[in-house]
Regions:
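Noncatalytic luminal/extracellular "stalk/propeptide" segments of secretory-pathway proteins
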Residues: 21-34, 39, 50, 54-153, ...
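Sec/Tat-exported extracytoplasmic proteins
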Residues: 39, 53-60, 73, 80-84, ...
Length: 365
């Protein structure tokens, strides 16, 4: 977990005249190179992630763990020496997962590993029992005739392809975000998707989904990759595949969480801002170490290292731990709306987020 190249670029931007990186003096360059070396040798980012995942753990937005995470982030920034630490409110509806179960009833009875998608409704008091209709991808589902899925469970089995730069995510994620709407339009009573991820382990991967106001809401869940393979193998045998699906999930009243913001004040142009950050929330099925504990660790450490320089950065460095990114970018939107309302958008010289894991940095995008 080494925020080396990103830290170097950010420190150069914070130190330099806007859009004039080539005008850096030797002192600025030496300071940036020193930051890089300290980041390579140190473990500050790792220590932040270890603290977050141990002392808070999963941080589903709107739950008590969310509130604990906010207090943790505020205290951590203060302990790391930020000049100013403060909270800004972020309000959003709360989605809660209670339980999820699925099994094949026929032709070859066996359990399935699933997880409800974020925002999904439940199946109600009685589990859904229905025949499966499988689709290779979202486009195939869209092409199905109207009414062809009446009383059926749609299963979308497209795979996410692994690429270093993550470009396989975009083509795959439509099944998750749009699958429930498209399946309901064809008459389906539920939709299952292959987990949007490249793991071959038997763990289902959650993520947010969407409904449309003019289409009935149906339950939506993700199958683990091996279980999606299992459904494909059963369907290929030409016999009707029938499932039982039992999901309890709900969206409840609005909740107010907070963006947690820490600043290292600039020495010459404190009103001009370089922002970096990650999102503080996570899903509830793991510790949130990668998504996005890693980004929190990288950006907290970067800000703290800049703050430890003998000479403060020319511009203010603002580190933001955003609330509820997972379910709709609520924290980022609230931050942008607050800056627009205050007339402060033009003060931002750079905005960057770390939400791509903890491998070696190879580009600043």
């Amino acid at each position: 977990m080494r925020p080396v190249r990103t830290l170097l670029a950010l420190s150069l931007l914070a130190a330099a005249p806007a859009f004039a990186i080539t005008g850096l003096d030797a002192e600025d360059i030496a300071a940036a190179e020193g930051l890089r070396e300290r980041a390579m040798r140190g473990s500050a980012a790792w220590n932040v992630v270890e603290s977050l995942t141990t002392e808070v753990g999963p941080r589903l937005a709107g739950t008590p763990a969310d509130a604990r995470a906010v207090e943790w982030a505020k205290a951590k920034m203060q302990a790391m020496g930020f000049d100013k630490v403060y909270l800004e409110p972020v309000t959003f509806p709360v989605w809660l997962r209670h339980h999820e179960r699925a099994e094949v009833l026929a032709p070859y009875p066996q359990p399935l590993v699933i997880t409800a998608l974020g925002g999904s409704i439940g199946t109600g008091e009685t589990p859904i029992e229905a025949e499966v209709v499988a689709f290779a991808n979202l486009d195939a589902l869209k092409a199905a005739p109207e009414g062809s899925l009446d009383g059926k469970i749609a299963v979308i089995t497209n795979r996410m392809v692994r690429f270093k730069d993550g470009r396989g995510y975009g083509p795959a994620v439509g099944a998750r975000s749009q699958g429930a709407v498209e399946a309901a339009r064809k008459g389906a009573v539920a939709v299952l998707i292959r987990s949007i991820g490249t793991s071959s382990d038997r763990f289902a991967h959650t993520g947010t989904m969407r409904y449309a106001a003019d289409v009935p809401r149906i339950p939506a869940a993700a199958l683990s990759n091996p279980d999606a393979d299992l459904i494909e193998h059963m369907v290929a045998r030409g016999k009707p595949v029938r499932l039982r699906l039992d999901i309890a999930a709900e969206t409840v009243a609005d909740y107010t969480s907070h963006n947690v913001i820490g600043e290292i004040r600039g020495r010459d142009l404190p009103g001009e801002v370089v922002t970096i950050g990650g999102h503080l929330d996570s899903w509830d099925l793991g510790t949130g170490a990668i998504d996005d504990g890693a980004g929190i660790g990288i950006t907290f450490a970067a800000g703290a290292l800049i703050g430890q320089l003998d000479r403060a950065p020319r511009r203010t460095v603002r580190v933001i731990a955003y609330a509820n990114e997972e379910q709709g970018l609520y924290g980022g939107k609230a931050y942008a709306e607050a800056r627009a309302a205050a007339g402060e958008v033009a003060a931002h010289q750079l905005g960057a987020e770390s939400d791509f894991g903890a491998g070696r940095a190879y580009a600043l995008c």
